Structures are given as C-alpha cells and as structure tokens.
Amino acid sequence: MLPSIAKHAALHQVNPLKKHGQNFIFDSSLCDKIVRASNLAENSRVLEIGPGTGGLTRSILQKNPESLTVIETDERCLPLLNEIKEYYPNLNIIKQDALKINLTDLSCDIVNSVGFAYKKREAKPITNRRANDIGESKAIDYKVTIISNLPYHIGTELVIRWLKEARLITSMTLMLQKEVVERICAIPSTKAYGRLSVICQLIAKVEKCFDVAPTAFYPPPKVYSAIVKLIPLENPLSIALINKVEQITKLAFAGRRKMIKSSLKNLVPNIHEVLTQLKINDNYRAENLAPQDYLRIAEIL
C-alpha cells in the first residue's frame, strides 16, 4: 500500500522548490474533488502536467483511465512517481519541460503506449473556421483529457498552446491562479474581460468550478487559486484565424480605454468601413466587444 501523499514526499525528501513554481497538495480529498469536476470517464487517456508528489496523479488513476501520462521536469519526483507506477502500470512518466512538449506528437505517443489502434474517419468538409489549415483533412480519432495543477508562471501560456490544438483534447480541468480563471471566464464590459477571455471563449466552453484557498497548499501561495474547466467546441477555429484574433485583441486591449476604431486603425486603415459592415459600434472600447465580434473582424480581414 502506498503511504499518504505527505509521507511519500517526506520519504523521498521532496520539498517544494521555488524555481519550479511548486506548491504541493497533500489533501487527497481536494485531489478527488478536482477529478470529480473533470467528469473523467473510464478508459480515458489523460495528461497531467507537473504531478510533483503525485496527489492528483493518484486520484486520476483511481478512476481507471486507459492511461495517464505525466510530464515532470523535477528529477527528485521521478522515484516517487515510479513507485506509484508499481501499483498502476497504466501510468506513463515523461521527464520533460512542459513548454517543450508538442501535444500532437505526445498524443501519438500516448496512443502507442496503450496499443490503441485507431481508424481514420471520413474527412469532413474543410472551412476556414475548422482546424484544417495545416493539412488536417484526416479527422483524429484519439483525444486526451488534461487534468493538472499548473505552475502559475507557465499556466496561461500552456492554456493558449493547448487551445490551438483543441482538436486533440476532450476537456481541460485546470488549477490556476484565481485571477487568471476569472479572466478566462469574464464577460464583456467587466474589469477582468480581456484577450484571454476572448481567445478561450472562442475555442472552448469555459466554466469556473470552485476556489481553492492558499491553505490547501504547501507552502501556501500568496493568492487564491481556482479550478476551471474548458471543453473545446465541436468545430475548432483554424490556427490562422486564432492567430488573427490574437493580433487584433493585442492591439485592441493595449489601448483598453481607446475606442476600437482608434485601437485598430494601424492594422486596418479602413476600420470604420469594416465595423460599419459588421454593424459594430465604432465608438465601443475593446472591453465592450463580445468574443464573436472579434471573430467576425478576423474573418473579414
């Protein structure tokens, strides 16, 4: 039988390191609650970033996934994770920096690791809104479910990267800084609404699940955390269109209090005509436009 999460970490002398952005969770009931929020189905293929001392890892494995692949950069955690693997052979451990992982390649590795043979579906019609601008005329039959307590310093970057590969993802249930979760879920004309809100909501259905107090971690961070769930929409946007939305929102929200016709004039000289054609009030500010408004601007450019 495995020791408790805290005792297991102590036995391996694994203490949280600031350089890795580590704040460990030793409360198994909280880990179970996170997994419940994901609605993880049996026989899913799961990805976890930064398992650390393996608390969330254990809770995921107890749900009988087909496989769980964990990405860990801290060598000190590997012996501990390998001990968990002795009880759960469907655990795959990869020592790597999460920012260097390509989800497309990783998904193929996950499939191969469980001997999963997939069939190619009949290709669907390609549109500029579907993620087919990189030659993806063949639909992908395998997807991963991502469940992770993400390091704060790379969390937002990972979310954006994964959203660009949404066709490979069933859902993402993530622990992030509470402020970041509020930005992901924010509605127009609110203080938290911004670029992250627009991009996330154009690609996925987003839902804040619950807050997590600093006292749930060791050591306690200075801020609250929260759990957010993102479920990619059925027809993901193309990479080209996402990049265009990123470009537009970067300009728009750089001058948050400027009118949109002023913020975007360097990108689109005839911005007044474009906004008029789309029936968007050109006196609106960046925070007043809904995600779909930004998408319509991107599509017409």
Curated annotation (Swiss-Prot):
Entry annotated with the keyword rRNA processing: yes
UniProt superkingdom: Bacteria
This protein's record includes keyword Transferase: yes
UniProt GO cellular component terms: cytoplasm
GO molecular function: 16S rRNA (adenine(1518)-N(6)/adenine(1519)-N(6))-dimethyltransferase activity; RNA binding
Binding, S-adenosyl-L-methionine: 23, 25, 50, 72, 97, 149
Listed EC numbers: 2.1.1.182
InterPro entries assigned to the protein according to its UniProt record, in alphabetical order: KsgA/Erm (IPR001737), RPE2 (IPR022436), rRNA_Ade_diMease-like_C (IPR023165), rRNA_Ade_Mease_Trfase_CS (IPR020596), rRNA_Ade_methylase_Trfase_N (IPR020598), rRNA_adenine_dimethylase (IPR011530), SAM-dependent_MTases_sf (IPR029063)
Family: Belongs to the class I-like SAM-binding methyltransferase superfamily. rRNA adenine N(6)-methyltransferase family. RsmA subfamily.
Protein name: Ribosomal RNA small subunit methyltransferase A
Organism: Rickettsia peacockii (strain Rustic)
